[in-house]
């Protein structure tokens, strides 16, 4: 079942989430601040759902920061919200809408 996006947004607005070690290292490598993640979630939309992910049910959210930086954020479902990874989508892997994966 896809997550309730409003509930996810509430967790992020209240800073009631964790970053996995992987997400934390990726955010540092990619110079993505927590505030930017929160901004992107607040305006974002779920573009992929992973109900059977090996780390537990999660989804991929696409959103923009206030500076218009596009981010993809994979996050687990509530009640224990964790960011699994975060990145700027690449035009090599994503269509121009940033929602659709390119197929090889």
Where are the regions a protein language model picked out?
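Ribonuclease/tRNase effector modules and their secretory precursors
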Residues: 1-104
């Amino acid at each position: 079942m896809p997550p309730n996006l409003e509930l996810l947004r509430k967790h992020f607005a209240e800073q009631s989430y964790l970053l996995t070690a992987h997400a934390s290292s990726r955010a540092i490598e990619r110079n993505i601040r927590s505030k930017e993640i929160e901004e992107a979630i607040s305006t974002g939309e779920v573009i992929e759902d992973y109900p059977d992910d090996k780390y537990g049910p999660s989804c991929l959210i696409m959103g923009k920061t206030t500076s218009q930086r596009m981010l993809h954020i994979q996050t687990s479902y509530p009640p224990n919200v964790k960011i699994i990874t975060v990145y700027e989508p690449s035009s090599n892997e994503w269509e121009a809408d940033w929602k659709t994966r390119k197929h090889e």
